[in-house]
Each structure stands twice: as structure tokens, then as C-alpha cells.
Amino acid sequence: MRTAFVIVAAAGALAAGVGFAQSGADVLKAKGCLNCHETDKKKVGPSFKDVAAKYKGDKGAPGMLVGKLKEGTGHPKAAATDEELKAAVGYVLSVK
């Protein structure tokens, strides 16, 4: 009985943890990225669609883009956690 309780409690904790992660779209909105970028047209910065097209098929793109956002090279330094940056970059690269 105790084993079953532990398994159920662990599964519940894992499921609850997933709900706390912000989606990439939420991060982009919360961090002000939409002030300079839009999904499908150039604003101050390139559109997410153009960024996704540029890096399509580039397996190193997610890490490189997260690095650029963290360091602020050619782009203002992002005030976000690594998890938030990965979610945002993942979302941008998925835009079609």
C-alpha cells in the first residue's frame, strides 16, 4: 500500500511540475520581445517566421540563439532564465 501511495504521489508531483513551465509564446510576451518582433512581419527586428526559415534544419541553432540572447551580441541582453530562453527559442524556431 505504501509503495502505491509513493508512486501516485511521485506521478502527481511530476505532472504538477510540467504545468509550471512557461510556454515559449508566453515568455516572448512577458519579456517584451513583441515590442520589436512579430510572428510574420519585420518590425524593429526580424519576424519569427524569418528567423525560423533562416535556421531551418540547423541543429546547432537553438543553442547558438540562446547564447546570443544571453550575451546580448547583436541583440539586447535578455533578462530571462535559461529555461525561458530555451522555450522562447524553441517557439520561434517552430513558426512556419
Each model region followed by its residue ranges:
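Positively charged n-region of N-terminal signal peptides that target proteins for export
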Residues: 1-4
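Hydrophobic helical h-region of N-terminal Sec-dependent signal peptides
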Residues: 6-14
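Sec/Tat signal peptide C-region and signal peptidase I cleavage site
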Residues: 14-21
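Processing junctions and N-termini across compartments
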Residues: 15, 27-30, 74
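Sequence/structural segment immediately N-terminal to covalent heme-attachment motifs in c-type
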Residues: 22-37
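Axial heme c-ligation environment in periplasmic c-type cytochrome domains
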Residues: 35, 44-56, 62-96
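Short functional micro-motifs and their immediate structural scaffolds
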Residues: 41
